[in-house]
């Protein structure tokens, strides 16, 4: 795969919310091998539960779920690895070549969502911890009723190293911070005000959610990423882009094939592309003393139909076609951590991770846990203080699959 194609995927992976097409002119200055080791080949042929056939990016609109995780040495020492970490950022993105359009929908990490891997509602951030990228894809499909064709996952460590490689960034910190450092081995203290931040400090600003909300956190992440790309556009940063590419490449994973990336690059880097962004609308909710973000069915339907239109699929006019509405009709509300009545589920709202495991007998056993060993919820030590509740987090039945937020 040539560097033109690799750079296209790297831009998508690192940004998570904005695709800077202007960087296409720099493609031929980038690394030759940044993404070979990051390809998830065993899931390259995954077909969405909501598709009759696997999509062809060269001929059809597609969707990609972008996942940002925080995998560091401190958390690994506590038994958490990349496959069992929570997702800190989740962006469902559609690519429509005929409209020259990319649409990105941000899904807040605390969104209450059905997770097929475990068979009950929980925070959507936990889906990745329960079963990796495929479990996260299944959860998004179950909630949104929109096909999720591919995923790109990036470790937040890439953000830290990229900021440092580019010499830091300037940002107006909204309040005094005292946050865990990148490896969760100490604290980072930052004063309020406009200042230059190194990678660890920038990540601390991006991660904090004790002073405001999950939505504000997402907005800060967008601002910091945009600033980082503006920094990369500076003339004196161009000679550092090769190193940035290597940084992102070693901290990413995806299930796109070389030919699929080639098709995407051909269509979206050689044409003017309109970028649209949105975020699920909803309300803060306390369920059993735990904070959740509860998107309205109206918002889910609205954005699902926009995304489905991008994918050239028919709209969903009946709210009862959304699982959340059927559950509310049946129980009166969404009930977390409680197995659902099977009559509420449709065949596409099933776990595909065990199916993938069966077809890949030699795969790493940590990627797909047997249903008899599914994780149980445990107290989340990083509670959302402004909501006054204690969060729940997935935890394995053994230390191998334990999770730390």
From Swiss-Prot:
Protein name listed in UniProt: Uncharacterized protein SAOUHSC_00997
Low complexity bias: start-end ranges: 360-373, 381-392
Transmembrane segments: none
Regions annotated as coiled coil: none
Keywords on record: Signal
Protein species of origin: Staphylococcus aureus (strain NCTC 8325 / PS 47)
Residue ranges, annotated region (Disordered): 348-405
Listed Polar residues bias regions: 393-405
Family matches, as NCBIfam families: lytR_cpsA_psr
Secretion signal span: 1-34
Entry superkingdom: Bacteria
InterPro entries, per database record: LytR/CpsA/Psr_CW_biosynth (IPR050922), LytR_CpsA_psr (IPR004474)
Gene3D superfamilies assigned to the protein according to its UniProt record, in alphabetical order: LCP protein
Family: Belongs to the LytR/CpsA/Psr (LCP) family.
